[in-house]
Amino acid sequence: CGRLAQSSMPRIQQVFVESDEADTDAFERALFLARKRSEDALQAHPDFHVVGLSPRLLGYKGMVLPSHLRQLFPDLARPELEARAVVFHQRFSTNTLPRWPLAHPFRRLAHNGEINTIEGNRCWSNARKDVWRSPLLDVAEFDTVVSQHGSDSQSLDNMLEWLLLGGMDLPKAMRILM
């Protein structure tokens, strides 16, 4: 990490959750709801962020150059850790200063660009919360589906995650969001 990143680096903790649930999809939805509940309960704490909570995906978040990833996360150098796919994003700040909460990746995508209709998109997604109900994922207890305070890419990632966990396939979800 550079000096700016180190001076503002949050406390990073990893947790591992084990389940007796044979249905990995159901377990993933349960973890999503647990994460949403914790985010709602701690929304007054702007530094609280859950990078990932999934039986399938492992997330790392850092305000760091690619060449320094192994220093920040030494477990990435372990040969027994293998991945079928990796999403990496190096943020080139356009109109905001680099900050840990804005560092990518988010949970489902990495997006580079400006979404100029962010407020409208957030309102659109929350207005359709009841329209896109899924028997697989009950989000009725939450006031909002997407982050109201994060970056434009974070809100897009929230919406994509919600559609996928609700049972929609990736191509259809992406068509809706584009």
Regions found by a protein language model. Name each.
Residues C1-M178:
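Conserved short alpha-helical segments that host acidic/polar catalytic motifs at enzyme active sites
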